[in-house]
Amino acid sequence: MKFGKVKKLHFVGIGGIGMCGIAEVLHNQGYVITGSDLSMTEVTDHLTEIGIKVVQGHVAENIDEADCVVISSAVHADNPEVNEAKRRKIPVIRRAEMLGELMRLKFGIGVAGTHGKTTTTSILGHLLVEAGMDPTVMVGGRVISLGTTVKLGKGDLLVAEADEYDRSFLNLTPSMAVLTTIEEDHLDYYKDLAEIMAAFTQFANKVPFYGAIHLNLDDSNVVSLIPDLIRPVRTFGIKSQADTRADNIIADGTATDFDLYYHDYRLGHIHLPLPGVFNVKNALAAISVALEFDIPFETIKKALESFKGVNRRFDLIGEQNGIKVYDDYAHHPTEIDVTLRAAKVAFKSRVIVVFQPHLFSRTRDFYQEFAKSLLMCDMLILAKLYPAREEPIAGVTSQMISDAAALFGHKNVRYIEDINQIPSAIAEYAQPGDVVFTIGAGDIYRTAPKILEALKK
């Protein structure tokens, strides 16, 4: 892979889940990579261990002799490193543009959707690895079977998440597209659902004439795109008209069984070690692509049944005194709803939730929907809102969700602003047999081990 005379690249916000994977791929291909981030985490520690220089904080001197500066969506325009790069006429590009360059040199498979991107990409990557195709895989989460967020393969395929935020996915050049779900989100950027759907249509139609668009027939918004799609369409889902279909679905604890059909022909039975029908649909998306490549059913079955999941997706952190603690990345009302439904099916016990809202704008736009989705839990604790890339919005706090949940009938809901007090609050309430979930896209995952410690006492 050659980028002309560009040899040194600096990543601003290198600890971001989408940034670190690209940095690692380029590092593995011989580029000199440096990066900076506001905080040091397991991700930045990993990058340091493999030889990438990472510094904490953003100052102009960090870019050193970089030939190009790569920034994430979370980086503000007044960032001193960005300003220094512009002053010195060093190219500044967004993460998605760099991912587009990587994808341009491979047969790219872009997985897009409001929900399910990470799990679908992870399953597909694992499946292609098991099929011996040695793909490059770039995921927005740590794939347990890969042990990382990225795998650099020698094959022709590159599988990556395609993020719709700020139309980032329009920078990509996919040879094949996967559309999981479409729903209102990122309303700080998009005007409405119609604008979101138009962006997804534009993304899908970037597929060349020799590619295909694999879409979820169970999602009405995705289906609504079909009349405007100009490339071959393949469908997956549980509806009887889907090309790749699951039937006889049985949820059993944290796993799901189903029969797989392709064009109404039964291929066989699959035991998926993931909970919920939503994960069956994620698996079907990956299977649809696998069948496009003529991967045999037995290989598909073996790959799915050996899939170990994704970090922060229904992720068991540990158990203490008969109380299990899970962590999940859900940060949209629909994601919370399907996670808690799966939890109720899996455990048949009391479910305690610690939810940390992510983004002021999302909380403002969906606080009532969040409250409704959280009514299924037996105890609800709201943590302080995680702002991520946003500045505060007057009057918008986690208290809005707490108040709405109480208004809608939740009998055991609290807002605890000090996150350090949450573990003891859980320990006082929890009983053997209960299940605790920390939920959110911010740093709430760090509270899960602390809850386990509190449960020891």
Indicate where each model-derived feature is located.
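Short acidic/histidine-rich motifs immediately flanking catalytic phosphotransfer sites
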Residues: 63-68, 156, 431-434
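C-terminal helical cap/extension that packs against the catalytic core
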Residues: 371-432
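Nucleotide phosphate-binding/pyrophosphate-handling subdomain across enzymes
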Residues: 2-10, 18, 25-29, 253-254, ...
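Beta-strand->loop->alpha-helix junctions that form or flank phosphate-binding loops
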Residues: 36, 55-58, 93-97, 138-139, ...
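Phosphate-binding loop of NTP-binding sites
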Residues: 25-31, 48, 61-62, 73-217, ...
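Conserved hydrophobic helix-helix packing surfaces used for dimerization/oligomerization
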Residues: 8-11, 69, 109, 135, ...
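Short internal beta-strands
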Residues: 31-38, 212-217, 353-356, 377-387
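N-terminal leader/targeting and accessory segments in enzymes
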Residues: 1-94, 98, 212, 220, ...
